[in-house]
């Protein structure tokens, strides 16, 4: 009997240890870490923060899981500000998760922050997102920050340096090959 209890204790300990080392996920079972692969530029690694922006993260993860972003572009680029991507077919809008819209979100728009783009309507965000190349204090409280680049800011900087037209569209398309989840990291 002692051997059985010892064995069960060992199994339980191993299970708890392995659980603690695993990738952080939401209740959806999908990881909160992603890779944005940008054709001819490289990879941007980011972590998503569902504790701060659960609706936004769930929406973004749903679109990533559906491969919505694959083949789209960073269609709006403003050097020393941000790169914006995800303009595609219309998807449903979500509630904006920021203080001006009555929702607490303490994430700041610092260099590397991922945030949702939107129109003037606070609840008009859907699929378009931007990555801050520089801190953007005005975004705090007015745009739904939901993640942060953990590696690959040099890629963001290279993208932010491409030549653009008068409406901030790149002269040569900057293509998002894919956005995928990082499993087991």
Regions flagged by a language model, labelled:
Residues 1-2:
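N-terminal secretory signal peptides that target proteins for export/translocation
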Residues 5-9, 13-185:
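Cyclophilin-like peptidyl-prolyl cis-trans isomerases
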């Amino acid at each position: 009997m002692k051997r059985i209890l010892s064995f069960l204790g060992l199994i339980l300990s191993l299970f708890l240890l392995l659980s603690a080392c695993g990738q952080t996920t939401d209740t959806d079972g999908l990881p909160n870490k992603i890779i944005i692969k940008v054709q001819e530029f490289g990879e941007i690694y980011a972590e998503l923060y569902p504790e701060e922006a659960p609706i936004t993260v769930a929406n973004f993860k749903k679109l990533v899981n559906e491969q919505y972003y694959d083949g789209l572009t960073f269609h709006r680029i403003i050097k020393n500000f941000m790169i914006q991507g995800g303009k595609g077919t219309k998807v449903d809008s979500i509630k904006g998760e920021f203080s001006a819209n009555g929702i607490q979100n303490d994430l700041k728009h610092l260099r590397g922050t991922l945030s949702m783009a939107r129109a003037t309507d606070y609840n008009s965000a859907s699929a378009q997102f931007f990555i801050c190349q520089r801190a953007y204090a005005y975004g705090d409280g007015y745009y739904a920050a939901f993640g942060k680049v953990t590696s690959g800011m040099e890629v963001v900087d290279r993208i932010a340096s491409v030549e653009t037209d008068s409406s901030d569209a790149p002269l040569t398309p900057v293509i998002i090959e894919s956005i995928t989840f990082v499993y087991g990291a």
